[in-house]
Regions:
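Active-site cleft segment of glycoside hydrolase catalytic domains centered on the general acid/base Glu
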Residues: 1-103, 114-126, 131, 145-153, ...
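Conserved, mostly hydrophobic/aromatic
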Residues: 27, 106, 166
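Substrate-binding cleft of secreted/luminal carbohydrate-active enzymes
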Residues: 110-113, 134-218
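Short, conserved beta-strand edge motifs with alternating hydrophobic and charged residues
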Residues: 77-80, 105-109, 137-140
Length: 218
């Protein structure tokens, strides 16, 4: 019953967006679902059982079904708050594949205070592109003067064009002050990135990491 309600709700939202002619390019099922979604039925914790995994994936697939039916051209994205944590990313994605939960884009959150180092992020993203051959989006990060270029350069450097993009959380909060005035310094960084990467001959800033990613255990 819960799965059907999730399916119906997701379908209604997708239909409304389509009718308003604002159909999204990406449909994300849940938010940072490495801890599950729709608690308690879809909750995951460190001691998750097979039943916990099954319950979560059935809920995810209900949303997936609605998205595919209404907006077949849109891409499905699953988001995990595991930016630099390779072992946990692989475990989750392998579970999704095993349980026939679909994803067209690998979505990850990355906050440097929680999700390991920039080098861990880079190594993880390179490993995931090699293993799963899917586009990757860092679809949540806290933009500041120190990390905007770092994170965007890492994603942009992924091989075979698999760096799908980045999304700052929450743009109206980080890019503007309480009076609504734009932060010129942050906008300047994004302007420079646009000019850097709009060129067809732009080269990646980072070289692939020279590590054995099979041994990464975060």
């Amino acid at each position: 019953e819960l799965e059907e309600k999730l399916y119906s709700y997701t379908k209604d939202v997708m239909i409304a967006l389509k009718q308003a002619e604002v159909a999204p390019e990406i449909v994300q099922i849940g938010n940072e679902i490495n801890h599950g979604m729709v608690w308690p039925e879809g909750k995951l914790d460190d001691n998750a059982t097979e039943e916990n995994w099954r319950s979560l994936m059935e809920l995810y697939k209900a949303g997936q079904r609605a998205g595919r039916e209404v907006l077949p051209e849109s891409k499905l994205q699953g988001q995990r708050a595991l930016g630099g944590e390779n072992r946990l990313c692989r475990e989750f994605l392998d579970r999704m594949i095993q349980m026939e939960a679909e994803f067209d884009i690998i979505g990850l959150s990355y906050y440097e205070q929680w999700h390991e180092t920039y080098n861990d992020l880079r190594s993880n993203l390179y490993d995931l592109t090699e293993r799963y051959r899917k586009p990757i989006c860092v679809c949540e990060y806290g933009a500041n003067k120190e990390n905007i270029k770092m994170i965007n350069d890492i994603v942009r450097s992924l091989p075979n064009g698999l760096g799908y993009g980045t999304m700052a959380w929450e743009p109206t909060r980080v890019l503007f002050d309480k009076e609504g005035n734009a932060d010129k310094d942050l906008f300047g960084i994004y302007d420079a990135l646009y000019k850097q990467y709009i060129k067809s001959d732009a080269q990646p800033v980072y070289e692939p990491p020279y590590v054995n990613t099979d041994t990464i255990q975060k």
